[in-house]
Amino acid sequence: MFGGGHMKKLLLYYHTIKYLKFSQICYRICRRLQRRLYNPYIREAGTVPSVNMDTTYTIPELDLDPDYLGRFNPEELQQNIFTFLHLKKKMDIRNGWNDMSMPHLWRFNLHYFEYLYSIANACRLSKDEKYYEKYKEIIREWIKNNPIGKGDGWHPYTISMRLPNWICTYELLYDKIDKDLQFKEDILRSLYTQYRYLQRNVEKDIRGNHYLENLKALILGSIFFKKERLLQKYMNELDKQIKEQILEDGMHFELSPMYHNIALEALIKINFWTRQERYTDTIARMLCVTCSMAQSSRLPFFNDCGEGVGKSARVMMDTAQKYFYINAQYRTSFEAGGYYILPSGPYRCIIDAGKIGPEYLPGHGHCDALSYELSVNGELIIVNSGTYTYERGKWRDYFRSTRAHNTLTIDDTEQSECWESFRVARRIKDSEGCMENHDGIPVFRGSCLNYKEQRHARSIMWIRPDILLVVDRVFASEYRYTKSYIHIHPQYELIWTDHWEITKEKKRTADIVCINADSAKKYRGDEINGWYAPEFGLKCENDVLEIISHVPVSGYIINFSNQPIDTALWERIMDIVEKEKIKSIK
């Protein structure tokens, strides 16, 4: 009845759906029915309530941060030229809002309206009316050409992003808008319509960061439109979501540093808008994660993560300190989230030993268990590959794959079955990590089972202040080989002499010495491997070392010292490896 391809697809669906909460399935069915049977009959708001202009909505340190504003060129926007995800397009703002030739995430960014801050700020600083006229034109054309409930602009997530941006820039340009009565009526009517529409279309089927953004927008809308009863309702629901989504150590439960920062920004803003200290303790815990993980404001690339999304770690810390008197505390272990940091003088290794994500929401997860990133004096040397796109296809598949991270495959088996853009079928389990002490040396130990229930255990330690040892153990009744990957930052390259060297501008930075390896091969810009995506929509070639081994215990040394490894140190290293081998046999 079913061919092999159909059966495989059915199994993927089965192993994906079985992890969902029953409520998610019910809400998904209800949302589909609502879109067809109810949403088409939603009409524009009639009477618009008075709005609250006694509250400050814009946080200058966040919303007008120069680095953030620099993402949007107000002069290009004057010509209807929009740039997102490193894709620039001159757009027809009458008919181009749902241009299917552009990536889905690009269209979503278009509907977020974050670029309004750049236009509004240019208007305030220059006093040039052309910016106000462009501000009005873009909003009016959106209202005119995006019928209620149709297209990307009425997706609950785009409403959740756009509504705060319209309200905050409304405040920034209030002196002008208050005198422009027709436009004032137009924007307020649309805002109220979007607010009411979102109330009926929250993303309880997806949950996670989407639902958090829904609640943020509804809380702001309730403050703006003076809906006190609804404000309390959404605040109470947010309390429940914080208990679910923010782990004990402060990490957001989707385990993406980027989405963690987005959730942190949402709570900072809600705390600011409500003039309460309701979430100050939660913000402090979350800020501890951001402060500890960030390197020169760059977050580590675990799970879906990239630069140029949200605000920088520095801006978050400065804002929280100014308004809530929070000083972030640095930590090296985040047990609930599964992240661990091994510092050694100028060197810093950050490791992921966590799950792929919540069982019912792994959509932003990558196959990066037991992977790490390594830096020296804040400069990255060994990196994960990042996130290039959310569009399904070979690039989405590659950047989520095990081989795109500094970890190990067993017989080329992925840690988890990632498929489509945001789906995961069978996945890793029993992932765990801890920090131990080995003869006075801090050691990270972690392990996980891939979806075929083959166990990979890894130990990472600084055996000297400038020599890192990585030891891998495989627990599997039958397997042929392992492949371990080391991804080098594009500023560096791998060179083979009589061993592998990491170099920068032809000068040696470190040696890589393989342990129990049968072969090693370098990739760069290959179809299989050798790509790095620092931001969405931007990828470049980088060197990747693939180390193949046929024995249960293998590994490598990264030697930053100026001295080769002497006999005494090598014997000590092999003694450690032998002890790990005994553990694997046991």
Predicted segments with their positions:
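Carbohydrate-active enzyme catalytic cores, enriched for enzymes
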Residues: 247, 251-383, 387, 433-443, ...
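Extreme N-terminal leader/anchor segments
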Residues: 7-89
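Residues that act as N-cap/strand-start positions at coil-to-secondary-structure junctions
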Residues: 76, 238-239, 326, 334-336, ...
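CBM-like, beta-strand-rich accessory domains located in the C-terminal region of large
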Residues: 3, 7, 16, 160, ...
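Long, acidic, intrinsically disordered low-complexity segments
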Residues: 46-75, 90-124, 207-223
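Aromatic-lined, polymer-binding surfaces characteristic
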Residues: 104-283
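Acidic/polar, glycine-enriched structural segments that form the non-catalytic walls/loops
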Residues: 30, 34-37, 41-60, 126, ...
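Residues that flank catalytic or metal-binding motifs in active/ligand-binding sites
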Residues: 111, 214, 338, 368-370, ...
